Amino acid sequence: MAAYCSRVYHHHPVSPSTMQGSLARPSIHAGSASLTFRARPNSVSIVRCDADSPPEGSAVAGWAPPGPYTGRDPAARKPAWLRQRAAQGEKYARLRESLGELKLNTVCVEAQCPNIGECWNGGGGAGGDGDGIATATIMLLGDTCTRGCRFCAVKTSNKPPPPDALEPLRTAVAVASWGVDYVVLTSVDRDDLPDGGSGHFAQTVKALKELKPGILVECLTSDFRGDLEAVSSLASSGLDVFAHNIETVRSLQRIVRDPRAAYDQSLAVLKHAKNCKDGMVTKSSIMLGLGETDEEVKQTMCDLRAIDVDILTLGQYLQPTERHLRVREYVTPEKFDFWKEYGESLGFLYVASGPLVRSSYRAGELFVQNLVRRKKAELAPTLQ
């Protein structure tokens, strides 16, 4: 979702499992009241959490397990480059009013994205006066997630409300009326649905393409529990960019993401989406500042390029509340510039890298639009 849109930690306890490798971490369980650490030379710390049940109503209250990876790190001070003005501007106000009237959710609001003013105003920062390319990421399937990743502000529940059957058409009508050329669709995780919500996603894409055939559609998806048939269903719906976030490096997956997510599962989803349709553009995103090393970031970028991911975004993790994961490091703008250059050297066709970059950050800017249209044009002769 994004935007980094995963969820407040809340799920049923799972049995601990041991992961192999020098950087492996065991499973983390919700409701931990007891945590133990083991440090090994030349490795990151390992944390094990013994599960208790979360308190009643915790999904709404924003409950997450306490421990050494939550709270505020006194050594980490938010630098000046992360300070943003409150969102304002005519375009921002108009878009927010329109979304409210149509009862459409956006990950921009639900995940507390720091770029909401810039994106909704068309690239002009919080106050407007940009290049006119406004981007809003519509969040389908409700505003309540079935997973509990420990970095996101989206509320969670094991039994969210059923999907709105009219949402695909309502979304398509709304987006078509805005006159935009590029739209991002995302969703909460819906493990309660047989297909993980891929059918609902696909209906929305098809409705958009019917109402506005020339529009470019990016879908920022969940992993659908690794169900590749669900991936195929969405990938063949007519979308132009298939995005799925790997979120963090391999060693931090169990600390950062819900245990139902996995590094290799995310790679498999992206690889399958790429192979589903000729010319498919794929995209992923990495958060920095969670305790990852440079070598781990490089390896993650190489793993994404090995499956031919085209677009990569890198941004600073920001802690939504005291109950979420601590920020371990504020990465400098200069280091983000390095990661952009490194990504381009690996062959990514487009890299957005900066402290406030999120996975849907200015997704529809002209370079990306031209990239997608060029790929479609290159493919056209083979389809005739």
From Swiss-Prot:
Chief location:
plastid
State the Gene Ontology terms under molecular function.
Answer: 4 iron, 4 sulfur cluster binding; lipoate synthase activity; metal ion binding
Q: Which GO CC terms are listed, alphabetically?
A: chloroplast; mitochondrion
- Radical SAM core domain ranges (all copies): 128-349
Write out the pathway annotation from the protein's UniProt entry. Protein modification; protein lipoylation via endogenous pathway; protein N(6)-(lipoyl)lysine from octanoyl-[acyl-carrier-protein]: step 2/2
Which keywords, in A-to-Z order, does the entry hold?
A: 4Fe-4S, Chloroplast, Iron, Iron-sulfur, Metal-binding, Plastid, S-adenosyl-L-methionine, Transferase, Transit peptide
| UniProt cross-references to NCBIfam families, sorted A to Z | lipA, PRK05481.1, PRK12928.1
Q: Which PANTHER family match?
A: LIPOYL SYNTHASE, LIPOYL SYNTHASE, CHLOROPLASTIC
Family in the record: Belongs to the radical SAM superfamily. Lipoyl synthase family.
Any idea what this protein is called?
Answer: Lipoyl synthase 2, chloroplastic
